[in-house]
């Protein structure tokens, strides 16, 4: 609950807990029954079908993480009925040139918003490089909200 409240401080209109059995219904309610236009999925695995249930017709799901597992159930019929764009993303198979182009585009799209404060990026804590073990312990404990920074 505390993390969801913090998300609202950073501009989220609605913050849902994907572990709640009611989150799909809450997402649909928050969108007037239409469903979510864009889901950025860092969990994958066991939430794949729930994401599609929460998505709008012609919605988009971008899978950027696999914290919930590499495999899971996938309702191909629901995917087709809603005409969902399901996009997988990784940097592991990209060339250096592709990564540079993505960084260039990201800067063009986001840098001004960050500089003006329209987009705020939470930094949870800053550790000297010598205390990297403590930083990793904080991350493993999932006690942070935002980025953990190592300074040199």
Model-inferred region functions:
Residues 46-118, 151-152:
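Glycine-rich phosphate-binding loop and adjacent beta-alpha segment
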Residues 1-47, 99-101:
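Adenosine-nucleotide cofactor-binding segment
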Residues 37-40, 60-64, 121-124:
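Short catalytic-loop micro-motif centered on adjacent basic/acidic residues
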Residues 24, 28, 52-53, 77, ...:
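Solvent-exposed, non-membrane alpha-helical residues enriched in polar/charged side chains
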Residues 32, 56, 140-144:
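Short conserved AdoMet
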Residues 111, 116-125, 133-152:
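C-terminal capping/lid region of NAD(P)-dependent oxidoreductase domains
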């Amino acid at each position: 609950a505390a993390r969801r409240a913090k998300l609202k401080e950073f501009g989220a209109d609605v913050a849902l807990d994907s572990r709640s059995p009611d989150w799909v219904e809450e997402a649909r309610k928050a969108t007037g029954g239409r469903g979510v236009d864009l889901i950025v999925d860092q969990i994958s695995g066991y939430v794949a079908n729930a994401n599609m249930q929460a998505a709008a017709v012609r919605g988009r799901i971008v899978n950027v993480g696999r914290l919930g597992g590499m495999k899971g159930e996938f309702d191909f019929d629901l995917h087709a009925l809603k005409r969902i764009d399901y996009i997988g993303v990784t940097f592991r198979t990209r060339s250096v040139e592709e990564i540079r182009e993505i960084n260039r585009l990201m800067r063009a799209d986001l840098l001004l918003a960050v500089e003006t404060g329209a987009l705020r990026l939470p930094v949870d804590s800053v550790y000297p490089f010598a205390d990297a073990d403590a930083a990793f312990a904080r991350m493993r404990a999932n006690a942070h909200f935002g980025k953990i920074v190592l300074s040199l």
